[in-house]
Curated annotation (Swiss-Prot):
Pathway: Purine metabolism; GMP biosynthesis; GMP from XMP (L-Gln route): step 1/1
Any one cellular-component term (Gene Ontology): cytosol
Physiological role: Catalyzes the synthesis of GMP from XMP.
Residues of the GMPS ATP-PPase domain: 2-190
Subunit organization: Heterodimer composed of a glutamine amidotransferase subunit (A) and a GMP-binding subunit (B).
HAMAP family referenced in this protein's UniProt entry, alphabetically: GMP_synthase_B (MF_00345)
Protein name: GMP synthase [glutamine-hydrolyzing] subunit B
Organism from which the protein derives: Saccharolobus islandicus (strain M.14.25 / Kamchatka #1) (Sulfolobus islandicus)
């Protein structure tokens, strides 16, 4: 059983010996992993640690301001760096999931490298955890913060040395450590948020319009699902065009947009399928049939209108370790409220759907 006190006692001398009198830049996303790593380092090393939040333009609505407020007591020297235009303009128009993730990684570490020079820091502290490098090494998806584990020499590539104190921990253990370090519950209990943020929830080609659509939709989804304490819950957006097919007697609509999955422990990049289903609790039978084909995510139709060009898919999962996950059985009336508000408040949304695919064969995020 994981004991956070023992972990801190063991890691403390190691960190102090490694860092010596050098400065450490701690990359903070506002998620539980990176923030826990930064607070751990700050508690052990004091003002040698410079925590930095890069606003990439892919954060949730008003997130940078919220994170700074949440962390005012535990990371009082947190610096927010506005890189929204740089990231958005460089990735705008890119379509393939892995290409977008890799471009994000390139931009992120280029920005980090500049900050390292600015603050004369030798070490970069990251919140990489076990699930991150397992997925990247397995070729399922590129986690932007996994570097050393896949043979990237950060000293040669960007001129800094990496410190990853949480690299052998899983999400539930990181939460225990966060509580032990007295992080505010808004951080210790918050659901995971990917490093590339809403970039990987803007499925297919990145456009500014689609990015803002998913930012608003995600805000609505979180508002309604916060009270349920699901492991992770969010919205994704993609273009609504595609075509109808019949697969093993099941009527389905296949979108042109594609999404990441994991089949046989390897990455799959397949179709997103929509079906009509009266009961999301009884979805397993047709999901099992459809994912035998080139399909990674199966969605149930919730509500739609005649005009609009974007589909919004709601994703909510329950999991212990994020290596496997089951979709949440959200009450029908809650899904109806979410769908209604999204269609009412966000222009250009044609339909709202619910993802009824477990992990595997889907990944939790679509990209």
């Amino acid at each position: 059983m994981f004991d956070p006190a023992s972990f801190v006692k063991e890691i403390g001398p190691q960190l102090k010996q490694k860092v010596g009198n050098e400065r450490v830049l701690a990359a903070v996303s506002g998620g539980v992993d990176s923030t826990t790593a930064a607070v751990l380092a700050y508690n052990l090393l004091g003002n040698k640690v410079i925590p930095v939040l890069i606003d990439t333009g892919f954060l949730r609505k008003n997130e940078a301001e919220k994170i700074k407020a949440y962390l005012s007591n535990v990371l009082p020297n947190l610096i927010v760096v506005d890189e929204r235009e740089t990231f958005t303009s460089e990735i705008e128009g890119m379509e393939e999931a892995e290409a977008k993730r890799k471009k994000f990684r390139e931009l992120f570490y280029s920005s980090i490298s500049s900050l390292m020079r600015k603050f004369n820091a030798k070490y970069l502290m990251q919140g990489t955890i076990a699930a991150d490098w397992v997925e990247t090494q397995g070729g399922i998806k590129t986690q932007h913060n996994v570097l050393v584990q896949i043979g990237i020499d950060t000293e040669k590539e960007w001129g800094f040395t990496l410190i990853e104190p949480l690299a052998d921990l899983y999400k539930n253990e990181v939460r225990e450590l966060a509580r032990y370090l007295k992080l505010p519950k808004e951080i210790s209990e918050r659901q995971p948020f990917p490093g590339p943020g809403l970039l990987v929830r803007t499925i297919g080609k990145l456009t500014r319009e689609k990015l803002e659509v998913v930012r608003e939709a995600n805000d609505i989804v979180e508002k309604y699902l916060d009270p349920f304490n699901y492991s992770q819950y969010f919205a994704v957006s993609f273009e609504s065009d595609g075509n109808f097919v019949i697969l093993d007697g099941i009527d389905a609509f296949l979108y042109k947009a594609r999404a990441t999955g994991v089949k046989g422990d390897v990455r799959a990049y397949g179709n997103i399928a929509k079906v009509e289903c009266s009961d999301i609790n009884a979805a397993k039978s047709f999901v099992d049939t459809l994912v035998k084909y080139d399909i990674t995510h199966v969605l149930c139709s919730l509500d739609e209108r005649s005009n609009g060009k974007y589909s919004i898919a709601i994703r909510a999962v329950i999991t212990e370790d994020f290596m496997t996950a089951d979709y949440a059985r959200i009450p029908k009336e809650v899904l109806e409220k979410i769908s209604s508000e999204i269609l009412q408040k966000i222009p250009n949304v044609k339909e709202v759907l619910y993802d009824v695919t477990s992990k595997p064969p889907a990944t939790i995020e679509f990209e």
